[in-house]
Amino acid sequence: MLPRLYRSVAVGLPRAIRAKSTPLRLCIQACSSSDSLKPQHPSLTFSDDNSRTRGWKVMGTLIGLGAVLAYHDHRCRASQESPRIYSKEDVRSHNNLKTGVWVTLGSEVFDVTKFVDLHPGGQSKLMLAAGGPLEPFWALYAVHNQPHVRELLAEYKIGELNPEDRMSPPLEASDPYSNDPMRHPALRINSQRPFNAEPPPELLTESYITPNPIFFTRNHLPVPNLDPDTYRLHVVGAPGGQSLSLSLDDLHKFPKHEVTVTLQCAGNRRSEMNKVKEVKGLEWRTGAISTARWAGARLCDVLAQAGHRLRETEAHVCFEGLDSDPTGTAYGASIPLARAMDPQAEVLLAYEMNGQPLPRDHGFPVRVVVPGVVGARHVKWLGRVSVESEESYSHWQRRDYKGFSPSVDWDTVDFDLAPSIQELPIQSAITQPQDGTTVESGEVIIKGYAWSGGGRAVIRVDVSMDGGLTWQEAELEGEEQHPRKAWAWRIWQLKAHVPAEQKELNIICKAVDDSYNVQPDTVAPIWNLRGVLSNAWHRVHVQVVP
């Protein structure tokens, strides 16, 4: 009787529960031998008189447990059959530990709040995706796209994304920015229209080469959508030479040249100048700088084919982009002809970025890359090149991107008196830890970047943990570069011991290049009304916890 009753209960339980429930499995083992009432464990001792009573108790327990587990399985199946539906706004509102941390993957919604502290890459990395999709971050870190990671994530599923939110909303045709490309959600946006954004510090120095999706973006106008098949680059010929109209295929016929170059916006770290006195410009933090491997035709080769040669008199190569405002005014800039014609300067008409065609935000199909020179001269969506006796008359060459004395204000400024920024000064910044965060005592890792314009190599980065009283030399990482052709940054790192009794750290970094240029210690003496050339010692204040 009892064995038959047990078997009927066990068969009635869901197969998955019978296999996975440890308590139930032990009960099954205790009652499924040929002598079903024979004790299977020393603690289970039945006398002949009460064995039947005890057996019924075991069966009662089994029946109750089976009912509970069967009901739980029913609820799980019902939940799977009818998942809760959440809107994109629901997910977006859960973007911190107080509200809960929700993310999406495909059509599924997950509450990963309890996993944040367990994330192998650290809490800060996972929080970058809080309130949004995981796909852009998994694209950066392919290690996530593994079956066991998806199985782990499945434990945190809470529902499905509303089907209406799985499609991008329609764009207004009259909006000049309606055709802008999609951007990576990790980017910190400083301006939506035109789009300007920087990668967060914790991602910026994760790798020597900045992944294309998180390369800082500096746009002045709407992003043009150019057809590579009909694209033409117009190069004005020299007197007696021949003007060129080059297709993308024509550019590919020139010898391909590759070079690793760091681009930095003139306004990088402008936010620190704004704390001293208000400036005009985007609130760039430390991320208006990135590094890529660029490939394309050398500008000197293209100019030579158009009949251009070095001149004894001053001359400038002027660039005009295909991005324009409603009046038809395009972005423009220029560099000295001497730099453009020097093969060692490695100026490119680039059509590849990190082995891929240029992304639209970064100048597709062709942009200028001028190693060692401020990002403002790296004209994107290049449409026209000419050689002139004077620099470009573009607003961004003549009336912007110039440095001034701290005494100059908007009532006294004269842009004609200041030269246009070309090469940038020595620069460094701390990317880990971030200002206002906490670190644990013991070994602390300090990370950052350093770079200098004009091909000058970074030879040293000094780091202080106590506000400048004492200094330690950081370890430099990155490619070895030729003298006077150090076009790319150095990533640096310092491992420092912090005693348990330490309460706070005032971390500072400063870099030195091979001309022994060093960063100024404070912002005030280099303040200027446009907030450019901000390269004072970078300072980070953190609390220490045991």
Swiss-Prot record:
Positions bound to heme b: 119, 144, 146, 148
UniProt region (Hinge), positions on chain: 166-175
Chief site of localization: mitochondrion
Sequence positions bearing Phosphoserine: 124
UniProt name for this protein: Sulfite oxidase, mitochondrial
Record keywords: Heme, Iron, Metal-binding, Mitochondrion, Molybdenum, Oxidoreductase, Phosphoprotein, Transit peptide
Pfam families in alphabetical order: Cyt-b5, Mo-co_dimer, Oxidored_molyb
Record organism: Rattus norvegicus
E.C. number(s) listed in UniProt: 1.8.3.1
Lineage: Eukaryota, Metazoa, Chordata, Craniata, Vertebrata
Function: Catalyzes the oxidation of sulfite to sulfate, the terminal reaction in the oxidative degradation of sulfur-containing amino acids.
GO terms under biological process: response to nutrient; sulfur compound metabolic process
PROSITE patterns: CYTOCHROME_B5_1 (PS00191), CYTOCHROME_B5_2 (PS50255), MOLYBDOPTERIN_EUK (PS00559)
Catalytic activity as recorded in UniProt: sulfite + O2 + H2O = sulfate + H2O2
Location relative to the cell: Mitochondrion intermembrane space
Record pathway: Energy metabolism; sulfur metabolism
Co-factor requirement: heme b; Mo-molybdopterin
Superkingdom as given in the UniProt entry: Eukaryota
Region (Homodimerization), start-end ranges: 403-539
Gene Ontology cellular-component terms listed: mitochondrial intermembrane space; mitochondrion
Keyword Transcription regulation: no
MF GO annotations: heme binding; molybdenum ion binding; molybdopterin cofactor binding; sulfite oxidase activity
Root EC class: oxidoreductase
Subunit structure, interactors included: Homodimer.
Cofactor: how and how many bound: Binds 1 heme b (iron(II)-protoporphyrin IX) group non-covalently per subunit.
Cytochrome b5 heme-binding domain segment(s): 83-162
Binding site for Mo-molybdopterin: 216-220, 265, 323, 362, 367, 378-380
Transit peptide: 1-80
